[in-house]
Amino acid sequence: MELIEKHASFGGWQNVYRHYSQSLKCEMNVGVYLPPKAENEKLPVLYWLSGLTCNEQNFITKSGMQRYAAEHNIIVVAPDTSPRGSHVADADRYDLGQGAGFYLNATQAPWNEHYKMYDYIRNELPNLVMHHFPATARKSISGHSMGGLGALVLALRNPDEYVSVSAFSPIVSPSQVPWGQQAFAAYLGENKDAWLDYDPVSLISQGQRVAEIMVDQGLSDDFYAEQLRTPNLEKICQEMNIKTLIRYHEGYDHSYYFVSSFIGEHIAYHANKLNMR
């Protein structure tokens, strides 16, 4: 992994690395925050998945998470949201193609050559992190919007691999809303059964479980009713007896003003779980 940015932050280092991804067949950037204690001991890892139009920079520059990661001794890994490059398929829209990988494994041309974000996040990236950084095997996952969707899907499908999961403003029923329907049709084809593998509400209804789910949702979010539908997640978790900490916040929108307001509580939540033995 090639170090391309290095910034001192709260006694640790906010770095950005570049590497070639075997899963995605392209060069990828990834942000890694190493708290002060990482110089002397191995620490657990929180993976953060960003939303539509984002890259590895949004979370590391806008959330203020470094203060809390340093306090709680957690390495934070923030990858890009899709494969990148002139040779990678793209679309002339913000919600498909580069910047909109949806954390799935595409099966349809032309997307299936590079768009294997599920494999990248689940397998390739953690292996790289374990090899290159002072990381323990204990990891949690979180994300925002499309990334909240990705975090929920990865945790629900691999409950033994992630200690805890949380999300900000996640797309909880992608097979039922325009963002998900358009992306899934392109990436996965018209067989809607394939879509359900990447739909948190559907996965829970099929019996997939995690110990607990934490979600924060702003009530002044322009996408709340049409695209996100947090109450669908709350309802299915109640029906399936999955413990939740779902909080609705008056006045907060879909932006990083919202994420930065509550990211400290999310990191504390994950730290509590990660440090339990």
Curated annotation (Swiss-Prot):
It catalyses: S-formylglutathione + H2O = formate + glutathione + H(+). Keywords: Hydrolase, Serine esterase. Its EC number is 3.1.2.12. InterPro entries: AB_hydrolase_fold (IPR029058), Esterase-like (IPR000801), S-formylglutathione_hydrol (IPR014186). GO terms for molecular function: carboxylic ester hydrolase activity; S-formylglutathione hydrolase activity. It comes from Escherichia coli O1:K1 / APEC. The active site is at S145, D221, H254. GO terms for biological process: formaldehyde catabolic process. The keyword Ion transport does not apply. The lineage of its organism: Bacteria, Pseudomonadati, Pseudomonadota, Gammaproteobacteria, Enterobacterales. Gene3D superfamilies: alpha/beta hydrolase. The keyword Hydrolase applies. GO terms for cellular component: cytosol. It comes from the Bacteria. Serine hydrolase involved in the detoxification of formaldehyde. Hydrolyzes S-formylglutathione to glutathione and formate. This is S-formylglutathione hydrolase FrmB. Belongs to the esterase D family.
